[in-house]
């Protein structure tokens, strides 16, 4: 066997350890449908894996990059198919739990999306929102610009309601 000193051996083990990570293609993807006259991006939050950023500061970089890529594709589809620059985001929270809530991730994502896709969001439609979404929304609300806030909708039994700080109670 190779002659490796104990500290070195420990280092090798750490390097080989893979952090559990979000299955990107299941978490965020283009929804191809003629039903809506818009490019649609789906985000299934149950596939989001929360990580400890202290241990792994760049841990979400791949997630952000993937989401930007998918949304860029959505803009391209909107332009070529619908002569538009807007997309709709479906945020489906079915099967999501408290353990997955990461406000830092949400805040960072908002900043990235607002700077990269300033005028491209038509609506963000939240489906199957658990009660804890309301807590998270209150926390991230101050970071969402006033125009974008108006684009958040709850979907309940096929009806859309705008999310306001009044109906978030």
Task: Label the predicted regions.
Residues 1-119, 123-127, 131-169:
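SEC14/CRAL-TRIO lipid-binding/transfer domains and related phosphoinositide-recognition modules
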